[in-house]
Amino acid sequence: MQHGTQRRSSPGEAKTMAAIHSGKYGKLLVSKGYCCKSRWSIGTKPIETPPDYLNFDIWNGPAQKLDFHRTLVHYNWHWFWEAGNGDIGNQGVHEMDVARWAIKDATLPTKVWSMGGRFLPEGKDQGETPNQQLTVMEFGETLLVFETRGLTGNKSFPDWPTQVTNEFYMEGGVIKG
């Protein structure tokens, strides 16, 4: 069984990683991942009693007890600190995993910095976690750069084949995913 990092099962991804790891294009300098999906406001809903069909105590698990509101359950949980960590941990983990996979023999980064926030054209909503975030990790001589942009999508980047992708910058060229 595989959970959460299914892109490692793709023959195309494995072929790309083999080419990068072989040194065919020189040393990997920067491994980038993007998650640029439109993630608009989740709105604001009042606190209420959970519906009868939902055992909210089980749903909440060991996290600090949350108040039930319809912006939390079922999909938008990742916009709240007690339940998630934003789009970097929702969609982002898939592209970040591929970016890290490209860094041969990577273990843990030696340095990390990250900045972001929750920015909405509609103003504030109930969400807490970032919908815009830039993270840079150092793995020796290779940087892993990961970016989530929740206010943009394909229309803003017509040359990108998907809203989520990876790019690999090497001494001898670039592979765009």
Where are these regions (language model features)?
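Contiguous beta-strand/loop segments that form the cofactor/metal-binding neighborhood of enzyme cores
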Residues: 15, 27, 32, 36-86, ...
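Rossmann-fold NAD(P)-binding glycine/threonine-rich loop
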Residues: 1-3, 15-18
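A generic secondary-structure signal
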Residues: 19-22, 101
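Beta-strand-loop-alpha-helix segment that lines the small-molecule cofactor/substrate pocket
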Residues: 1-9, 23
